[in-house]
């Protein structure tokens, strides 16, 4: 089964089902300060491992960058 997601406006395909936590690892942003919105709703960090992504989900992934 191919999982088709839209991430920051771009289509992406993954070979298997993913949780938000799995997606974070796939995108290489684990350990960074991030915010994830799924279909218009913010996903709390405490729920990353429990929220299963579905084919067609639209996600916005924002990585915080420090500066001054």
Model-derived regions, located:
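Ubiquitin-like/PB1-type beta-grasp interaction modules and other compact soluble beta-rich domains
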Residues: 1-67
């Amino acid at each position: 089964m191919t999982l088709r997601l839209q991430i920051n406006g771009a289509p992406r395909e993954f070979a298997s089902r993913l949780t938000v936590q799995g997606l974070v690892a796939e995108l290489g942003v684990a350990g960074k300060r991030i915010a994830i919105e799924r279909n218009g709703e913010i996903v709390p960090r405490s729920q990353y491992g429990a929220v299963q992504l579905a084919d067609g989900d639209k996600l916005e992934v924002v990585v915080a960058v420090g500066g001054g």
